C-alpha cells in the first residue's frame, strides 16, 4: 500500500527511525513510502505522552514534520500562522535539529502550550496527502510519486475556511483533479480540524482543543482523556472560566446545551441549502459539458468556479464532525457566501443559454 506516514498518527514508537519529511536516507531505517507492514513490525504502542510532550523536559512540542514545515518554512511566511506567530492563539516555536543519528530530524518546542497545535499534528490537512496539477499545462506540480514531495511544500496553508484555502490553491495556478460529470477543476480536501479552530474566534482568543474536550475536574485540573463537551457541559462550555463566567455569559448547563443544539440546527439548514443550490449548478454544468446547452464563456467560467468552491466547502465541513460548533460564525459566513455565489452564477449562466 505504501504511504506509511499515515501511521505517524497512530504511534511514535518509530519516530526516530524516519529522516525529516520521511525522505529516504541510507542511515534511516524507515521512509514514508515504505510498505505498511514493514513499519507495523516496529510498532508496539499507540501514540502517547511523547507525541505532545518532550520526554526530557515535559515541554509542549510538535514532532509531526508537515506541521513543523508549515510553522517554520519560508514558503509559508505569508499564511496565517507565520504572519501571526507570537499573538494570542499563535504561540512561537523553537525548531531543534536532532540529526545525531546521521540523518536529519526535527522537533519544535512551543513557547506556550496550545493544544490546537499539539492535537493538530494529526487533526490537520496538509498538502503532502494530495496531488497537485498546474493550470498551465495540466502536468504534475511535483515529481510523480514523490513521497517527500521534493521541491514541493508539504505543510498546511493554515487557511481558516474553505474559501480561503480554495483561493490560495487556485491563485497559485493549481488544482487537484477534475470532476468527471461536470469537467470542473477541483480543489480536494482533508480533515482541517486544526486550521478551522485556530482561525475561529475561540482559537484566536487562546481556546484550544483541550478546553472543550478535556473536562475540568473538581480540583481545577483537566481530565487527560478526550470526551465530547456535550457529555459534560457543566465542566466544559458552562464552567466559570468559559461561558459560565458570572461576569460574562453566565450560561447554565441547559443554556450551553441549547446553544450547541441551535448551532447544529443552523448547520443542518445551511447544509441543505448548499446541497440544493449545488445540485442546480451541477445539473446545468452537466448539460453544458454534454453540449445540450451553450453558455457564454465568462458566465460558464464563473459557474465552474462557484461549483468547484462548493465541492471544496462541502468536503471541508462534512469532515468536521462538530456540525458547525468548531467555528459557528465562520461556518455561517462561509456557507452563506458559497450559496450566494452558486445562486448568482447559476442564474447568470441560465440567462445566457443559447
Feature-to-residue mapping (PLM):
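Primarily the internal scaffold of c-type cytochrome electron-transfer domains
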Residues: 18-211, 215-352
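Glycine-rich active-site/cofactor-binding loop and its immediate structural neighborhood
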Residues: 6-10, 17-22
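Short loop/turn segments at strand-loop or loop-helix junctions that form parts
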Residues: 10-11, 54
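Long, charge-dense tracts
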Residues: 1-5, 12-14, 41, 46
Amino acid at each position: 500500500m505504501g504511504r506509511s506516514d499515515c501511521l505517524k498518527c497512530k504511534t511514535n514508537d518509530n519516530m526516530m527511525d524516519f529522516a525529516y519529511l520521511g525522505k529516504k536516507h541510507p542511515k534511516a531505517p524507515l521512509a514514508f513510502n515504505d510498505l505498511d507492514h514493514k513499519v507495523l513490525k516496529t510498532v508496539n504502542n499507540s501514540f502517547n505522552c511523547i507525541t505532545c510532550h518532550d520526554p526530557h523536559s515535559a515541554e509542549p512540542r510538535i514532532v509531526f514534520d508537515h506541521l513543523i514545515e508549515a510553522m517554520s518554512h519560508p514558503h509559508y511566511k505569508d499564511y496565517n500562522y507565520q504572519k501571526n506567530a507570537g499573538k494570542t492563539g499563535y504561540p512561537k516555536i523553537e525548531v531543534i535539529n536532532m540529526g545525531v543519528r546521521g540523518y536529519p530530524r526535527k522537533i519544535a518546542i512551543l513557547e506556550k502550550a496550545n493544544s490546537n497545535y499539539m492535537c493538530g499534528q494529526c487533526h490537520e490537512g496538509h498538502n503532502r496527502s494530495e496531488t497537485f496539477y498546474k493550470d498551465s499545462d495540466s502536468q504534475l506540480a511535483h515529481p510523480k510519486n514523490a513521497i517527500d514531495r521534493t521541491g514541493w511544500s508539504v505543510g498546511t496553508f493554515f487557511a481558516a475556511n474553505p474559501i480561503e484555502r480554495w483561493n490560495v490553491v487556485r491563485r497559485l495556478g493549481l488544482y487537484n483533479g477534475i470532476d468527471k460529470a461536470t469537467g470542473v477543476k477541483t480543489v480536494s480536501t482533508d480533515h482541517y480540524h486544526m486550521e478551522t479552530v485556530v482561525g475561529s474566534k475561540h482559537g484566536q482568543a487562546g481556546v484550544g482543543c483541550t478546553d472543550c474536550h478535556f473536562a475540568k475536574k473538581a480540583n481545577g485540573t483537566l481530565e487527560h482523556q478526550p470526551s465530547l463537551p456535550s457529555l459534560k457541559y457543566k465542566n466544559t462550555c458552562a464552567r466559570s472560566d468559559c461561558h459560565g463566567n458570572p461576569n460574562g455569559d453566565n450560561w447554565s448547563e441547559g443554556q450551553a446545551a441549547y446553544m450547541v443544539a441551535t448551532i447544529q440546527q443552523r448547520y443542518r439548514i445551511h447544509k441543505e441549502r448548499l446541497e440544493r443550490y449545488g445540485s442546480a449548478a451541477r445539473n446545468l454544468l452537466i448539460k453544458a459539458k454534454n453540449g445540450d446547452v451553450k453558455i457564454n464563456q465568462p458566465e460558464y467560467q464563473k459557474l465552474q468556479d462557484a461549483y468547484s468552491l462548493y465541492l471544496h466547502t462541502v468536503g471541508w465541513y462534512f469532515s468536521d464532525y462538530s456540525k458547525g460548533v468548531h467555528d459557528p460564525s465562520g461556518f455561517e459566513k462561509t456557507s452563506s457566501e458559497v450559496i450566494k455565489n452558486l445562486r448568482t452564477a447559476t442564474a447568470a449562466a441560465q440567462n445566457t443559454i443559447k
